[in-house]
Curated annotation (Swiss-Prot):
Protein name: Imidazole glycerol phosphate synthase subunit HisH
Originating species: Leptospira interrogans
Gene giving rise to this polypeptide: hisH
One GO CC annotation: cytoplasm
A GO BP entry: L-histidine biosynthetic process
GO molecular function, one term: glutaminase activity
């Protein structure tokens, strides 16, 4: 069972619909008991870093989530701000992140040479894979995904980065450490490439 984590933020039904079309059992989960029945977890996230961390803490499931991911090694996929909270901290706020992947979330800060670029980045962008990874199997070369964000993760360990995109310079847009995965882009909004990526995650 794939659990789509409902902690008050994120586009939950879009993930559920894609997974249903792919014939993967899934449910939107809110409670500890529901979460414990999951074999994989998707963490959507929309909003600010601090508000998402607050929502996760207020939900009462943070400790169980950490146990499932860090001790029982259940695969987890963080999306957009759901990926950012995998990091240790963010320039956007003062809260600590989950710290499952060491790094800091930074804001796009363009000089005059990139003055035509807007923040947030909204729309489609090519993604370049750095290394072979189960999450990115069978995607077309330089696939395009949908982005909507002002911040990006800067990892301390290069090996945690599996893909980057270019927006005024290269930035990390997908990460993986052991059973922990993250995408800055929105696979649930990215048509066939997003469907392929979610199929890969669901098949782990």
């Amino acid at each position: 069972m794939i659990g789509i984590l409902d902690y008050g933020v994120g586009n939950l039904k879009a993930f559920a619909n894609v997974l249903k079309d792919l014939n993967f059992r899934n449910q939107i989960v809110k409670t500890e008991q529901e979460l414990k029945s999951c074999t994989k977890i998707i963490m959507p996230g929309v909003g600010s870093f601090d508000s998402v961390m607050d929502k996760l803490s207020e939900s009462g499931i943070r400790d169980v989530l950490s146990d499932l991911v860090m001790s029982k090694k259940i695969p987890v996929l963080g999306v957009c701000v759901g990926m950012q909270i995998l990091a240790s901290s963010s320039e956007e706020g003062t809260k600590s992140g989950l710290g499952w992947i060491q790094g800091k979330v930074k804001k796009f800060n363009f000089d005059q040479s990139n003055s035509l670029l807007t923040v947030p980045q909204i729309g489609w962008n090519e993604v370049t894979s750095i290394r072979d990874n189960k999450l990115l199997l069978n995607l077309e070369k330089n696939p395009r995904f949908y982005f909507l964000h002002s911040y990006y993760m800067e990892c301390e360990e290069d090996n945690d980065v599996i893909a980057f995109a270019d927006y005024g310079g290269n930035f990390t847009c997908a990460v993986n450490r052991d059973n922990i995965f993250g995408t800055q882009f929105h696979p649930e909004k990215s048509h066939h490439n997003g469907v392929a990526l979610l199929r890969n995650f669901a098949s782990l």
